Amino acid sequence: MSNALYQSSISSLPLLGHGKVRDNYAVGEDKLLIVTTDRLSAFDVIMGEPIPDKGRVLNQMANFWFRKLAHIVPNHETGVAAETVVAPAEVEQVKGRAVVVKRLKPILVEAVVRGYLAGSGWKDYQATGKVCGIELPAGLQNAQKLPEPIFTPAAKAEMGEHDENISFGEVEERIGIALARQMRDISIRLYKEAAEFAATRGIIIADTKFEFGLDENGTLTLMDEVLTADSSRFWPADSYQVGTNPPSFDKQFVRDWLEAVRIDGKPWPKTAPAPKLPDDVIEKTAAKYREALTRLTGEELQ
């Protein structure tokens, strides 16, 4: 586990905060250093053990997509190498896992796009026949492809709280009609293009979450992470079957173990502290992340 980074400590830059997975530092007035650690969060609780290489995998995967989708929407990239903004002794902490990005004004709405019925979307549909207030045809099954991808936004929650699904009308009220529609249309376009590409690599992108901010001119800008195994549900196309829970290339291993684990004979209540992850779950999860990178991008971990 020696190559794992649970939390960065960059003392040469002001720390802005630790997120669930990322540590953010200020680089001057207009840029940020984002370090993707090997922390893993499941059910909005941060696990106590790192997943080796996970941060580097996510960073490389996000950078791949930012480049691939740059013609659709501006993104937060600056082209400044992370190694150049930290002290020499700190370079090892940022190598392969950090980016220097534009400092944006974040839009506090998660832009979720679903192409398939899965997870909380499937639960919503079973209960109401809708997902986030969007009427869907009757008789759909778990993991079924939707007639068209749908935009199902969520309100960003405080750390440790669950993000809350909201209707498109609520997004319009929060950020204004024009910006809400632009965000929806761009999100669906990003999803469609990514899903088309992933299909050629034998991967289904069931759903994904985009995050946007506004730059100093008020331009909508893609930020944070994009189409990684943390922000998306990736399914291998060769084992996909409607009506089942397809195995995904993400933290599903950890989630399944957490659902099954018993603490003093009782299920884990999905609140901190998390139970200690066994080594085999950590190793299998690390392997899944690496496999997702190679299958999707054709790149080895750099």
Curated annotation (Swiss-Prot):
InterPro entries: SAICAR_synt/ADE2_N, SAICAR_synth, SAICAR_synthetase_CS
Domain of life: Bacteria
Cellular component terms per the entry's GO annotation: cytoplasm
Pathway: Purine metabolism; IMP biosynthesis via de novo pathway; 5-amino-1-(5-phospho-D-ribosyl)imidazole-4-carboxamide from 5-amino-1-(5-phospho-D-ribosyl)imidazole-4-carboxylate: step 1/2
Its EC number(s): 6.3.2.6
Biological processes annotated in GO: 'de novo' IMP biosynthetic process
CDD domains xref list: SAICAR_synt_Sc
Family of the protein in this entry: Belongs to the SAICAR synthetase family.
Descriptive protein name: Phosphoribosylaminoimidazole-succinocarboxamide synthase
Gene: purC
